[in-house]
């Protein structure tokens, strides 16, 4: 991985890590204020989710696929500032129109995603309406952030979400101080003031996250002035990409509705068919918690690497330097796979300690209901992460068709497996099947994805090195999982925990200690296997971290960093301060 991409990935990852920490504090305060069950908690989760779902549709179809590649191309033109002002103005106009339209449609959207009591529906509609402006600010954040990323200014872009979380924490803190815990309060308790302190302050935080980016935007020499018009900014050639990309997220959201409805109905169906308590069956809450933990390494590492590499690959392709783009893509895929395979092993071997360490307020019984879908999701983590980088590469080629084909196949597998499971398996297994379906849907069609990608690189995407790297990481992952699973019960006994099939005892300290010990075990096995197999990516990743994290090592005197082939690549850190 090149020096600039490695540095920028670490900047993005550090910002994401800080965002996750403050976000976890926000989650704790949210649970304190509204609880984790009951109509208020469910209504708030739905209200905050719906605008993000709508924005995902927009970001996939317009911003990530169209505007970001055009930003890279525009920066090379003589009248870059004029064209960028047009792009920003176009984005603002589209976002304002969409936000207003979705605000009007809020009651219909709530009925589509929420299946609950009249109280839940009414409060969810109010929360959703307060959160709707987030669509505008998320979009603005993406556009301005990618301009900064294209200019190698990552710090504010990476860290602004921390400010959003802090503002939301202040809102929840004020709510708790003024009104206490609202888990069992009636519907008439929820006045506009109380809704504003919860949903409103979160929207205010997202607004800060976007608007603060105008400060570094000015520092790089671009002073935004509204300028209407689309002539000369190259959007015509990107129209098909937008259409294909919108199709991707459209199919994805259809499957998301299927997942949500199946997961929500699982406890009720188990109670109805098997006469079980709904509290003993994994449902939507179990799945959402598993998916949130699964997304931690994905958002911290995969998204950071993809965000950092995208402008670089786009620039190489715009310059018709296919060899440079191939080298960057190969390096990113090989290094990313090595890292994500380790996290996959961790999710398979120690899901329970991870869950109890991150969610100390839940019981072992609840954690066990989350652990199985988390392990199932972990199986597909490496390839789902790789797809993100490959998707961005297709977009750099102005190609939205091939990512759509892959995702259409993926979503068909997911939807088909999930729906079939509701007919042939008991409701107690539905959530695990959802996790497995997601993993399998990325694994089975992955060879087709690489075949389609190969056509963009003159028939060669550095296949031999990538396949070799993936195979070595897979062998190391299997070895780490086998040894880790053999040691797991012994580690539980060592720390004093007792885990049965459906329940057990493990406090927070025991969970943390178990997680540390099992992580050490799988890390030793994983790294030893990679070393024995002479995986060149191991040297690359460790060298990149050692050169940039204080106490782990020193940077090469030449100012470069070791690339996967052992050569030194000149650092670009001295090219300017990062904003």
Task: Write out the residue ranges for each language-model feature.
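Membrane-embedded alpha-helical bundles of multi-pass transporters/translocases
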Residues: 1-579
